[in-house]
């Protein structure tokens, strides 16, 4: 398999991209975190769950390497002259783990995309970004939008949303989760200057009582759930994810908010990352928390997210994996998997310090 893969250095890839970037498919085999911190412009992140990796037994199907059906179809049709694999800094494929993402991707491409030349990028992203920084996209250390907290509030916001003050969760501005996805509070949603500065075109209001202030200017989607342990937020996951994707595909940006931007809206953002990037809850949670440190979904929402994880990462695993999240929670299923996250009690608008309840969250084990 290694003999069928060519070697490119940073200069070779730069020349290849200049000749025809549209005819070169870049597959980045690094982690979700590493890819989002910085990647070659136009590259696609390759990742799959531990369960899928284990079941592959060294022979991963191309549908797991390139899950996007359109890209995979172009690849199989010979539309790409070259496919380039890369990791962080490896000098060759010789040292790649046999069950690692890089080796599994190379094997699948050599078996199923035989009409396309497969290359390995020598030195990986580290060497290429040092040599060709202008061809890379890097995300700076995430910080909220720095705008002054005006004491004036739009007339539409003065009545109906009591959280439009400046407690901790309203300070700063919305935070960027992905280039097209932002998270924040109802106060931020009442600040048209903030939304316009970020290029927001649509909002998801994850509450039953916060108003949509600017319906004539932005596209809105309402998810009327309360922040309590009886609420079934998981029934909205797929609908919210599809809405975010539709805005992204149209070139827009989505701002997701609830009352405080801590529990309900954070849960929706976590579900989006888990399904679209096929990552585990703990990885998605850490990714979002690095950007908005006060996120703290309530106990029930965390349980529903853990059940959603089993559906996302092992969709063909068993009947249990596809069962509704709330049904599993109601059954009181015995547990063997324990995760520790900061988990909130329902949030109410007050100027007092935020309360956090540290406790392990459990759910039924995935297959």
Swiss-Prot record:
Instruction: Indicate the segments forming the Tyrosine-protein phosphatase domain, all copies.
Output: 173-314
Please report the stretch or stretches of sequence annotated as the Rhodanese domain.
20-137
- Tell me where in or outside the cell this protein is found: Nucleus
Q: Which reaction does it catalyse?
A: O-phospho-L-tyrosyl-[protein] + H2O = L-tyrosyl-[protein] + phosphate; O-phospho-L-seryl-[protein] + H2O = L-seryl-[protein] + phosphate; O-phospho-L-threonyl-[protein] + H2O = L-threonyl-[protein] + phosphate
**What outcome follows a substitution of residue 258 to S?**
Loss of phosphatase activity
**What is one Gene Ontology biological process annotated in the Swiss-Prot or TrEMBL record?**
peptidyl-threonine dephosphorylation
Supply the induction statement: Up-regulated by growth factors and mitogens.
Q: Which residues are annotated as modified residue Phosphoserine in the UniProt record?
A: 359, 364
InterPro entries named in the record: Atypical_DUSP_subfamB, Dual-sp_phosphatase_cat-dom, MKP, Prot-tyrosine_phosphatase-like, Rhodanese-like_dom, Rhodanese-like_dom_sf, Tyr_Pase_AS, Tyr_Pase_cat
Keyword Aminoacyl-tRNA synthetase carried by entry: no
Q: Please report any disulfide bonds recorded for this protein chain, giving both cysteine positions.
A: none
Task: Summarize the PTM comment.
Answer: Phosphorylation at Ser-359 and Ser-364 by MAPK1/ERK2 and MAPK3/ERK1 reduces its rate of degradation. 'Lys-48'-linked polyubiquitinated by NEURL3, leading to proteasomal degradation.
Principal localization?
nucleus
Q: Which UniProt keywords apply?
A: Cell cycle, Hydrolase, Nucleus, Phosphoprotein, Protein phosphatase, Ubl conjugation
Q: Which residues form the signal peptide?
A: none
Q: Name one GO molecular function term.
A: mitogen-activated protein kinase binding
Cellular component per GO, a single term: nucleus
Q: What is its EC number?
A: 3.1.3.16, 3.1.3.48
In the UniProt entry, which residues are flagged as the active site?
258
- Supply the SMART domains for this chain: DSPc, PTPc_motif, RHOD
State the function annotated in the UniProt record. Answer: Dual specificity phosphatase that dephosphorylates MAP kinase MAPK1/ERK2 on both 'Thr-183' and 'Tyr-185', regulating its activity during the meiotic cell cycle.
The record's family statement is:
Belongs to the protein-tyrosine phosphatase family. Non-receptor class dual specificity subfamily.
Query: What's the protein here called?
Result: Dual specificity protein phosphatase 1
User: Which source organism?
Assistant: Mus musculus
């Amino acid at each position: 398999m290694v003999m069928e893969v060519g070697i490119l250095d940073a200069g070779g890839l730069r020349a290849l991209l200049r000749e025809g970037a549209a005819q070169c498919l870049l597959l980045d085999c690094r982690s979700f975190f590493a890819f989002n911190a910085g990647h070659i412009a136009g590259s696609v992140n390759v990742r799959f769950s531990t369960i899928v990796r284990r079941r592959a037994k060294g022979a991963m199907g191309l549908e797991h390497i390139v899950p996007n059906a359109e890209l995979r179809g172009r690849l199989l049709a010979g539309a790409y002259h070259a496919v380039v694999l890369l990791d962080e800094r490896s000098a060759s494929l010789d040292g790649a783990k046999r069950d690692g993402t890089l080796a599994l991707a190379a094997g699948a491409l050599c078996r199923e995309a035989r009409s396309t030349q497969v290359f390995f990028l020598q030195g990986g992203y580290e060497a290429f970004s040092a040599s060709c920084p202008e061809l890379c996209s890097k995300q700076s250390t995430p910080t909220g939008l720095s705008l002054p907290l005006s004491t004036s509030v739009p007339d539409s916001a003065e009545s109906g949303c009591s959280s439009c003050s400046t407690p901790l969760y309203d300070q700063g501005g919305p935070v960027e989760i992905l280039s097209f996805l932002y998270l924040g509070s109802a106060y931020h949603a009442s600040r048209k200057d903030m939304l316009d500065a970020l290029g927001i075109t649509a909002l998801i209001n994850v509450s039953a009582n916060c108003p949509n202030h600017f319906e004539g200017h932005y596209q809105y989607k309402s998810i009327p759930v309360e922040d309590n342990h009886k609420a079934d937020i998981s029934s909205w996951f797929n609908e919210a994810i599809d809405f975010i994707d539709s805005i992204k595909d149209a070139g827009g940006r989505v701002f997701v908010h609830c009352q405080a931007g801590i529990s309900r809206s954070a849960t929706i953002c976590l579900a989006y990352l888990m399904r679209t990037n096929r990552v585990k809850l703990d990885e998605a949670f850490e990714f979002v928390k690095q950007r908005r440190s006060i996120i703290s979904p309530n106990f029930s929402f965390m349980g529903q997210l853990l059940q959603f994880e089993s559906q996302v990462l092992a969709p063909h695993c068993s009947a249990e994996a596809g069962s509704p999240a709330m049904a599993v929670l109601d059954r009181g299923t015995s547990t063997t998997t324990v995760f520790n996250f900061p988990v909130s009690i329902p949030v109410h608008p007050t100027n007092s310090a935020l309360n956090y309840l540290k406790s392990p969250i459990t759910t039924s084990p995935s297959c």
